């Protein structure tokens, strides 16, 4: 079934690891289910901001042409390892119906974002 993914966000960690656990056979469209990244890192202060302020910060960042989005396609039994402060989102999901075909993603965050002086 077709569903929207997790909207644009950044993780409050140093390194994020996403494990995609659902087999490829469940994915009805190889163009869906992956992650889009922007080459922009949120500032450390971002994590203490209100939800409205976070939205404004992220929108301004992804509107910048230098943000240059790129997609990492979904793959069952695949790992995506990235700097947590990079803006990213889950792309639209189009997987087969049924519990056993749900897109399962396990995310582990390591460390805290480093503060630069």
Model-derived segments and spans:
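Catalytic core of non-heme Fe(II) oxygenases with the double-stranded beta-helix
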Residues: 1-117
């Amino acid at each position: 079934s077709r569903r929207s993914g997790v909207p644009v966000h950044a993780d409050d960690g140093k390194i994020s690891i996403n494990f995609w656990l659902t087999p490829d056979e469940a994915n009805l469209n190889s163009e869906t289910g992956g992650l889009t990244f922007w080459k922009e890192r949120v500032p450390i202060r971002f994590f203490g901001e209100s939800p409205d302020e976070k939205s404004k910060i992220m929108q301004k960042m992804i509107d910048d042409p230098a943000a240059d989005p790129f997609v990492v396609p979904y793959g069952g039994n695949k790992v995506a390892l990235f700097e947590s402060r990079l803006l990213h989102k889950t792309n639209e999901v189009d997987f087969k119906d049924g519990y056993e075909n749900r897109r399962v993603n396990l995310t582990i965050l390591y460390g805290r974002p480093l503060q630069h002086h």
